[in-house]
């Protein structure tokens, strides 16, 4: 099951204005996500293995890029997860793995506590900026239309709003607040699995990242 943090953004008309630049601020953690709804949804997944019936995703409206994973990696982990699922089934349980994907996962303490495995993909600012630019916009929810509307960043939105908000939301995870290439703060060294993505000095390949992530998930999945 994939749970997209972006689906928990408030309706467009409820997004607050930035106090300095007077444009809607979709990225400041406090107002970018409907945190009570996300917490309740994760609780529902934990208790019932499913999102609430009222949940609606508009992620399918956004541009989807294929991320190639080595076939041998996919095959190996597909078998491993199936084996674990079968072991749970033999004991009368239906195991559900829920992957929560998002840009602000480690800001809200209640959300953090709900996650059994915490993985952070570290990407330098220049790559983040390029990816944001290449998306050409985001589909967002509005109260009158569940299909949402398309948001496009106005000029200088990245420099003035997006990246400063990203730093504020993640600096507590790293020593000296260095979100670019810093070490994890002692509090998070054992709690957070750190992956080095595109543009990092020690860039991991996709196969290696999948291996680390999958092994971390299975480490808490033993029947």
Regions found by a protein language model. Give the residues of each.
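Preference for well-ordered, secondary-structure-rich cores of eukaryotic proteins
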Residues: 1-3, 12, 16, 21-22, ...
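Conserved nucleotide-sensing/catalytic segment adjacent to the nucleotide-binding pocket
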Residues: 10-76
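NTP-dependent small-molecule kinase module
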Residues: 93-95, 134-138, 160-223
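Conserved beta-strand scaffold positions in the cores of enzyme catalytic domains, especially
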Residues: 2-4, 118-120, 191-195
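Conserved AAA+ ATPase "sensor/coupling" helix adjacent to the nucleotide-binding pocket
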Residues: 41-49, 134-141, 173
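C-terminal regulatory/interaction module of P-loop NTP-utilizing enzymes
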Residues: 107-109, 114, 142-151, 156, ...
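Intrinsically disordered, low-complexity domain-flanking/linker segments in eukaryotic proteins
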Residues: 52-94, 142-148, 178-191
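ATP-dependent NMP and nucleoside kinases share a basic, alpha-helical "lid"
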Residues: 73-144
